[in-house]
């Protein structure tokens, strides 16, 4: 969203050396040449529910309750694109329930048979079967042929991003490639490689105005800052008050095409 000019990320200088990093998020007018998907709209509205500026730390333990609406829209989008026949999260939940019931029944059967008969071992297969279902629940959502094709495309693009240095001659002639594909590098966990590849060109990226820092632009430091922001954001918006169930932001993109929610010109990041 920042790369696409929906918001600006501003580093907040630390007041002391061991202080925690924080960022100010500032909403911008919606670009005329870009459209948001429903889950992106919900994410943006959730971030700026209280105004057009918010500090990232202020979202801790408050955003998680809004996150479920974002995830619902994301999973619905996956189904509407025909990547899955059913929402992956609901398929997983179904198998977790079945596995839990089988495990509980197996344990209960083992105890009852052990007390009243000599056939206590007969309940163990049910318990083991339930345990296996619980472990395998996250792999149960099956992609459609279209979803599998998208996964292959994403995995292929991941290889391209990971080996960015091999494509520098082509990308050097294109405008704003570093910034445009940076969100993918973050998702794929290769921000440092992406930055080093473009640093070798010996020129600064054309547009990083969406990220404001008091330090001059250096590729390595910029990659570091972006990774730090990404990790902090993931933890912050999924953080719940003590005693509440976690929303589990780690599952936000799970079950999709190679882990990505898909669509929206570069993801919601």
Describe each PLM feature range:
Residues 2-106, 116-117, 143:
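Donor-sugar nucleotide-binding helix/loop cap in glycosyltransferases
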Residues 111-130:
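Hydrophobic alpha-helical transmembrane segments
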